Each structure stands twice: as structure tokens, then as C-alpha cells.
């Protein structure tokens, strides 16, 4: 019932820019957050391709055949499995962030999307066991990726949803997650709305 109500509100709020039948195709690339995303439900008027594996990071993504995303609008959401345990206080963290930025840009370019839409890495508290310093680092990494995408992949878009999933003190909004890592229906509704706003 809650999901039906959310869908109704989604239509009311965004009906003026609703998708048109056969308007376009979308390609989604990511980890378990994308894998669990019911894309056919949230984007019913699009032809959707999904490349997503639970536990995946950039290394795994680089081995995938994403040639069907070339020249297509592609939404990339990945990174939590790569940097989800890095704390802002860790030794050498600045070097790690720069190195990760370079790897991320290289992997994103390989998709050859047009345009590429990158969703920010979400805050997390996997199974209620993580230090909020992890989210402080994710926030900084997102800003680094945002700046790099602007210069390294012209025409790409960075959709920042980090703050929408964050509570005070770098704690996550528990009401938007199932397990501190994967969004629940309300969380996926937010992601879908933000993507629609960027199309």
C-alpha cells in the first residue's frame, strides 16, 4: 500500500515532465544498490538495460561488457564497495581519494555513454556497525568526483543525493534504508525522482 501511495505522489509531483512512450532508452550500471532497484517499475516507459552485480566495485565493472550502453543515457551508481570502509581520519586518505578519482574517471569513460549521469555514493551504516567517519569521507570523495567529471567527461552530470540520505552527525537516515546499506522503497523513490529530474 505504501508503495502504491508513493507511486501516486510521484506521478502528481512529476506529471508535467512524465516520460513519453518510447521516448528513449536507459542503461544502468552499478553494484547491489542498482541490482535491487526495480527499474521497470520506476521507469515503465523506458527500455532499460541493467549491468549490476552485488558486491561489485570498479575492478569488477571494468570486466563487464557494457557496449550496449555506448551512446546511450547511462546512470552510474557505484563506489560503496570500494570506499565504504575508508574513514576521513585514515592515514594517507588524501592520496587514496585522488587515486580512486582517477580510477573512477577511467572506468566511467570506458562506458562511452551519452550522456553519463553519475549518482553520488550514498552514505552508509552497514548493518548498524559503521563509524560515521566513513560518511564524512564519502562526502569528500563525492565532491572530488563531481569536480573531476565536470572537466574530464564534458556533458556528464553528477546527481548529488548524499545529503538526502544523511541525518545529523554524519549518521544515515534510517527511514530510507533497509539495512543501513541498501535503500528501501522510499529511498529508491528518491533516487528515481532525482534521475527523472536529470533526464
Task: Enumerate the predicted regions with their spans.
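Alpha-helical cap/lid subdomain in secreted, periplasmic
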Residues: 43, 47, 62-199
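Positively charged n-region of N-terminal signal peptides that target proteins for export
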Residues: 1-4
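Serine-esterase "nucleophile elbow" of acetyl-processing enzymes
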Residues: 7, 16-75
Amino acid at each position: 500500500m505504501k508503495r502504491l501511495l508513493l507511486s501516486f505522489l510521484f506521478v502528481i509531483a512529476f506529471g508535467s515532465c512524465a516520460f513519453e512512450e518510447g521516448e528513449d532508452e536507459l542503461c544502468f550500471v552499478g553494484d547491489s544498490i542498482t541490482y535491487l532497484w526495480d527499474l521497470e517499475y520506476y521507469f515503465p516507459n523506458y527500455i532499460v538495460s541493467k549491468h549490476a552485480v552485488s558486491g561489485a566495485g570498479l575492478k569488477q565493472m571494468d570486466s563487464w561488457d557494457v557496449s550496449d550502453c555506448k551512446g546511450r543515457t547511462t546512470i552510474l551508481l557505484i563506489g560503496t564497495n570500494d570506499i565504504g570502509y575508508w574513514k576521513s581520519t585514515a592515514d594517507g586518505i588524501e592520496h587514496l581519494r585522488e587515486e580512486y578519482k582517477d580510477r573512477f574517471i577511467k572506468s566511467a569513460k570506458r562506458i562511452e555513454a551519452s550522456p553519463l549521469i553519475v549518482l553520488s555514493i550514498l552514505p552508509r551504516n552497514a548493518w548498524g556497525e559503521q563509524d560515521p567517519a566513513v560518511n564524512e569521507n564519502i562526502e569528500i570523495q563525492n565532491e572530488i568526483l563531481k569536480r573531476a567529471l565536470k572537466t574530464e567527461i564534458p556533458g556528464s552530470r553528477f546527481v548529488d543525493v548524499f545529503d538526502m540520505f544523511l541525518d545529523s552527525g554524519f549518521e544515515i537516515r534510517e527511514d530510507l534504508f533497509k539495512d543501513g546499506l541498501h535503500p528501501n522503497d522510499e529511498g529508491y523513490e528518491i533516487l528515481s525522482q532525482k534521475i527523472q529530474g536529470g533526464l
